[in-house]
A protein has these predicted regions:
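His/Asp/Glu-rich metal-coordinating catalytic cores
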Residues: 1-37, 53-212
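Conserved G/P- and acidic residue-centered "switch" motifs that form tight phosphate/ATP-binding loops
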Residues: 40
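N-terminal Rossmann-fold NAD(P) dinucleotide-binding loop
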Residues: 45
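A short acidic, amphipathic alpha-helical/loop segment
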Residues: 48-52
Length: 212
């Protein structure tokens, strides 16, 4: 079969609902991607890698060592932000639902002190109690928000990285190689020269990140 090489896998950044919808959908099947080449660590170029690997991508992620090292911090941090954001949105949903319950006939069975106790149960000190929030959302069949990926997903994605020096030809497919050259964008960023044979002819194509 034909090899498919993915150049970057970035996160769309914009308004929450629009970004969430775009980021969850790939215009390709991750299982069909042979390998991926990452130009640099910025989230708009690397941010969906944990989603890619969670959806059964089975190849390797090629980058410079500096880019791989940066992703070891940026991807878990991205996951933490998404998990925190989802928890806060679910907390707001739960609080709103409790407000509606308070106005309903069912509220007559719950004292004000009891209702305040339920609200307080959604937090542990100054932190949100995600288990209590999720349980309330499930109990009342509310629409919750899931993070795009978790910190566990991000840590797992880091095991897919293979780092290489600049100007070193790397085999990324059958008859396909890539070479990383200094891009001068951020530390570790690279322009990728992909070399392959097409209809018996050798071709070379430069790229500084493509898929976002």
């Amino acid at each position: 079969g034909q090899d498919r090489i993915l150049l970057d896998c970035g996160m769309f950044q914009g308004r929450r609902n629009e970004a969430a919808e775009k980021n969850r959908v790939f215009p390709f099947d991750p299982r069909l991607v042979t390998n991926m080449v990452l130009s640099h660590a910025h989230i708009d170029h690397s941010g969906r890698i944990p989603l890619l690997t969670r959806r059964d991508f089975a190849g390797r992620i090629i980058s410079t060592r500096a880019t791989a090292d940066a992703c070891a911090y940026l991807l878990p941090d991205s996951a933490y932000i998404q998990q925190s954001d989802a928890a806060y949105l679910n907390y707001k949903t739960a609080r709103t639902a409790l407000g509606e319950i308070r106005k309903s006939k069912k509220a007559k069975k719950i004292s004000n002190r009891g209702m305040e106790g339920i609200k307080k149960s959604l937090k542990k000190g100054h932190k949100l109690d995600t288990e209590a929030i999720d349980a309330l959302i499930d109990r009342h069949h509310l629409k919750g928000v899931d993070p795009l990926y978790t910190m566990e997903d991000a840590r797992e994605a880091l095991t897919y990285f293979d780092d290489y020096p600049y100007r070193h030809p790397i085999t990324v497919g059958n008859g396909v190689t890539c070479t990383l050259y200094e891009a001068g964008h951020i530390l570790g960023s690279a322009i990728t020269i992909v070399r392959a044979k097409e209809k018996g002819r050798a071709i070379s194509r430069p790229a500084l990140g493509v898929f976002t």
